[in-house]
């Protein structure tokens, strides 16, 4: 397997078990436009992809309703603190610590709005592990006209920020890998000519990850450590 030196991590479903706060906030946003969703399986599909993408896909919502629902989502999630209704997966902090100590370059590449990403990472005590913490523009979820997927744009932005910090372009191209939990992460990585190690302990199924062409799949944090060449230990 390729020896990776630069690790780009998704947040929700990869570093963070974030379902409780997101699901409450999605319900709150949908309720505001008269959609009273009770199917938790359907609600969980909102974890990872941009909110506007899922709202249009599942309900065919009009743009004005999408704006209203996202605004109400953020009211509960950000202003009322639901974003902190989450926790890091067991063993992920140790993995990050080991990777940093071993000389890996670490970055967060999440489609969650960047201010939320930074606050959650700080709340977990993980900020010092990362050279770059990259999320979406808070208004990007309202953009209906982008030709490149939001995840692909964020991964591209993450790589650009790493280059600006002096990391070698050729080495990034050969030795960087995306780590995420959905087909959306796999596709975004491949759109940037990066491999993707997918984790099935998040919100995407193993079948979904395989169907999107994940380069490897880790079912546990311990397996992810093994794939990254880090010493094994307790998960």
Question: What do these predicted regions represent?
Answer:
Residues 178-218:
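Acidic, Mg2+-coordinating phosphoryl-transfer loop and its flanking beta/alpha structural elements
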Residues 1-45, 59:
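Active-site neighborhood of HAD-like aspartate-dependent phosphohydrolases
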Residues 124-135, 208-228:
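Structural recognition of alpha->loop->beta junctions
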Residues 57-94, 102, 167:
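Metal-dependent phosphoesterase signature
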Residues 114-177, 183-191, 206:
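Substrate-recognition "cap/lid" segment bordering the active-site pocket of phosphatases
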Residues 3, 79-108, 114-121:
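Short, acidic loop-to-helix structural element flanking the phosphoryl-transfer center
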Residues 29-30, 50-63, 120, 154-162:
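Helix-loop "lid/cap" segments that line or gate small-molecule binding pockets
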